Every structure is written in C-alpha cells, then in structure tokens.
C-alpha cells in the first residue's frame, strides 16, 4: 500500500503543474498530459516516487541522519517549520543565506550570537540595560531567529536535505551538491530534476500539496527513529492505483 493514495494526491492538487510555456523539458518523463495550457503531472509516477522518497528518508533516519527541511516561499514556510519540528529536525523557511552550509563556521558565529542574546534575557541582563539597548538587542535577535532560528540547534551539516521547490531554492541545491548532501525534493514542471537525488514530481505551489508531501517526509523520519507505530497517519487511505490513465484524465478535466 502506498504511503499516499491517488485520491489524496488528487484532492491536494498535486497533479497541477505550471503553464506549458514555463516547463523544463527535463520534466517530460513525469508529465501525463496538457490541459488548457497547463501541464498535468503523472500521479501514478508521483505515487511510486513518494514511496521511494519515504523509504529513503526513513532508512536515513534509522541511521541517525540529520535532516534539513528547506522551503522559503509563502506556500511552504509554515508546513516546512511545523513538520521539521514535529520530526525533531531542522528548517530554513525564510530567505536562504548564501553560504549557509558552505560557510558553516561563519553561520555558527551568528548562531552563537543568537544564543548569547537569549542567555542575556534568561539571566536578567535585559533588566539592567538601558531600554534603547534592549530594543536593539531584540531587533537583532528577531532577525537572527528569522533566518537561522531553525538551524540554531542543528549539531552538524545535514546528512539529507528535503527541499520544496528546488527551482526557487537553487542556491540551497548548489550548496548541497558542493558538499555531497543528498537532496529529496518536490519538483514541479518548471524545475530541473537533474541535480535532485530523489525526485517527487508534484505541484509545489499549492499549500495543501506541500503540506501533504512534507508531512509524509516527517512521518518517514519519525518511523525511522521510533518505529512504525510512531508515525502519524502512516497508513494511507485505500490506494486508488487501479484507476486507469483514462479515468485520471477524466478527473483532471472535471468530467
């Protein structure tokens, strides 16, 4: 049984790609058809590739992998943070800072600064400082928290990265490739799948689609760490794989 059923994929709109004029030809193997100027992703392939991604992440998690979730656009930011935290992992959900991984030591100095400011407040230092200085410290902390708060406790460079929309996160993908970090990603029809190690062809612009796939990656981590019973909603609804391509086309066309 698939970890996500065909019905769930359809209901979340995972099959809707971009306008045909915006496509990346390298995504052709994952495209089922074209309707009204929009590419339709082949959900039979997505269903199988989600399973592959789930197993890949689960197996990595069993080995104690550190997983970094990345998704900085508004449709992804909330799900990326929520699911990373649920899985006990780390995230970047605002702008990716160039060198976030390739200049890891420099980023760590900013992490140290964030922790210093938090410690100052915890120890009561804020109470004896001038109000103007406290305001400045809070502004600095807010900015640091926004950009690096999700990796402040990450013990090392990640072993695996999960990325929503590698087309938008090209800098993150490039840094992962430079460091040899495998990338699992939701890849829409406008993106280049070649740099991605584990491709999940999917609509990366719909909040429901992003939430569905991202939650399954979190489930995979939880299952890998704690066993099958710990993963929420691990068993998908009865798979609708028997639906023929013709039936899928009818659903897409709204017949």
From Swiss-Prot:
One GO cellular component term noted in the UniProt record for this chain: cytosolic small ribosomal subunit
Keywords: Ribonucleoprotein, Ribosomal protein
GO biological-process terms attached to the record: translation
Cited Pfam families: Ribosomal_S2
InterPro entries for the chain: Ribosomal_uS2, Ribosomal_uS2_bac/mit/plastid, Ribosomal_uS2_CS, Ribosomal_uS2_flav_dom_sf
One function term, GO molecular function aspect: structural constituent of ribosome
Protein's UniProt keywords contain Protein biosynthesis: no
Keyword Kinase among UniProt keywords: no
Region (Disordered): 233-255
HAMAP family linked: Ribosomal_uS2_B
Family listed: Belongs to the universal ribosomal protein uS2 family.
Name of the protein in its database record: Small ribosomal subunit protein uS2
Source organism: Lactococcus lactis subsp. cremoris (strain SK11)
């Amino acid at each position: 049984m698939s970890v996500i059923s065909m019905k769930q994929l359809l209901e979340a709109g995972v099959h809707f790609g971009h306008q045909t004029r915006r496509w990346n030809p390298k995504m052709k193997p994952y495209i089922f058809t074209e309707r009204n100027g929009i590419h339709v992703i082949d959900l039979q392939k997505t269903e199988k590739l989600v399973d592959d991604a789930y197993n890949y992440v689960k197996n990595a998690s069993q080995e104690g992998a550190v997983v970094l979730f990345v998704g900085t656009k508004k449709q992804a930011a909330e799900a990326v943070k929520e699911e990373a935290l649920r899985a006990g992992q780390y995230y970047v959900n605002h702008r990716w800072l160039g060198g976030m991984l390739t200049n890891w030591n420099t980023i760590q100095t900013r992490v140290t600064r964030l922790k210093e400011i938090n410690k100052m407040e915890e120890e009561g230092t804020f109470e004896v400082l001038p109000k103007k200085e406290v305001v400045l410290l809070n502004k600095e902390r807010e900015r640091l928290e926004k950009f690096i708060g999700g990796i402040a406790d990450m013990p090392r460079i990640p072993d695996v990265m999960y990325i929503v929309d590698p087309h938008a996160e090209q800098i993150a993908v490039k840094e992962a490739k430079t460091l040899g970090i495998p990338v699992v990603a939701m890849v829409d029809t406008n993106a280049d799948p070649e740099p991605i190690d584990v491709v999940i062809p999917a609509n990366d612009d719909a909040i429901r689609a992003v939430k569905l796939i991202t939650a399954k990656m979190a489930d995979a981590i939880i299952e890998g760490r704690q066993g099958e019973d710990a993963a929420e909603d691990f068993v998908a609804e009865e798979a609708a794989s028997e639906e023929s391509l013709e039936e899928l086309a009818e659903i897409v066309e709204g017949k």
